[in-house]
């Protein structure tokens, strides 16, 4: 007869008699019917127990799935070589990107003020990254500037961008070069008092030059230089005023002709110079015109002479 280590199971006999224990009998005698409150509590408890039991079953199933999924992974990792396992662990321990907003478990253990500072820093970096992505610019200092194609291109190119909160600097229109048409006429009307100041100053300088006593030679020479400079400025200003006056008269005549049904005629730069030259010589005598022409000829000849190359020495 062979003996096995396993115990034999008893055969199931439905007519088998079981002896009743004494303590079971005592419990049955001591049983009392439950009260109404207990019955209400029991009637509500099965639903709660079923919910709790269902939740526990779900948790157990999730744990079993995780453990079942992790066991094959552990078996696969155990079969890998040491180098492969090292690379896999390094890949898992890679740092998070700067723009990621996921919270590490170590951050939860830090004090509240540290976590607040870290969140503020992350928000600042994210806002800076968003601003740099939205605002066009240049990748490097030598690269061309990138502009958004969704914004309309301005007619005027901004060479120097002013700071965002900069106030406009005051300008002196007397030194503005681009004054034409009505702007120039308005400027001359608004600053007509400057001509009076200049005339008064020129009269005082002439008095200083004509005075024989109480003026040193150095002061007299200084007054002569100032007077010559102011006279040149006045002549150039008068010439400029005359040019604007001639162009205004020409435009006025053309407007009258256009009203009569004729086509407008616009002067070219060369024709404007001829018109100004004719007006300049119209108020001169014959001798003054000859002197002006000779002076102009010498000036042009001097410029041409400067442009000529130096004469080469001949070989002996």
Swiss-Prot record:
Its main location: nucleus. InterPro entries: RRP36. GO terms for biological process: maturation of SSU-rRNA from tricistronic rRNA transcript (SSU-rRNA, 5.8S rRNA, LSU-rRNA). Belongs to the RRP36 family. GO terms for cellular component: 90S preribosome; nucleolus. Keywords: Coiled coil, Nucleus, Ribonucleoprotein, Ribosome biogenesis, rRNA processing. Pfam families: RRP36. Residues 218-260 form a coiled coil. This is rRNA biogenesis protein RRP36.
């Amino acid at each position: 007869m062979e003996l096995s280590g396993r115990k034999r199971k008893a055969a199931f006999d439905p007519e088998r008699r079981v002896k009743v224990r004494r303590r079971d009998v005592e419990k049955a005698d001591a049983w009392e019917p439950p009260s109404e409150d207990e019955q209400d509590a029991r009637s509500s408890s099965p639903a709660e127990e079923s919910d709790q039991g269902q939740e526990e079953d779900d948790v157990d199933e999730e744990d079993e799935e995780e453990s079942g999924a992790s066991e094959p992974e552990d078996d696969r990792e155990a079969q890998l070589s040491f180098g492969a396992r090292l690379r896999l662990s390094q890949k898992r321990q890679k740092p998070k990107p700067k723009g990621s907003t996921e919270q590490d478990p170590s951050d939860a253990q830090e004090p509240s003020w540290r976590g607040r500072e870290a969140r503020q820093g992350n928000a600042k970096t994210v806002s800076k990254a968003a601003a740099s992505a939205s605002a066009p610019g240049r990748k490097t200092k030598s690269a061309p500037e990138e502009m958004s194609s969704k914004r309309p291109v301005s007619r005027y190119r901004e060479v120097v961008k002013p700071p965002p909160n900069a106030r406009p600097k005051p300008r002196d229109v007397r030194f503005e070069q681009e004054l034409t048409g009505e702007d120039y006429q308005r400027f001359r009307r608004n600053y007509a008092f400057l001509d009076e100041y200049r005339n008064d100053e020129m009269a005082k300088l002439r008095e200083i030059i004509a005075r024989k006593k109480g003026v040193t030679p150095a002061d007299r020479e200084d007054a002569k230089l100032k007077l010559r400079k102011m006279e040149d400025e006045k002549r150039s200003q008068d010439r400029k005023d005359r040019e604007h006056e001639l162009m205004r008269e020409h435009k006025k005549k053309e407007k009258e002709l256009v009203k009569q049904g004729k086509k407008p005629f616009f002067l070219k730069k060369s024709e404007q110079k001829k018109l100004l030259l004719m007006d300049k010589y119209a108020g001169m005598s014959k001798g003054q015109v000859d002197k002006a022409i000779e002076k102009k000829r010498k000036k042009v000849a001097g410029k041409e002479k400067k442009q000529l190359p130096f004469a080469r020495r001949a070989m002996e």
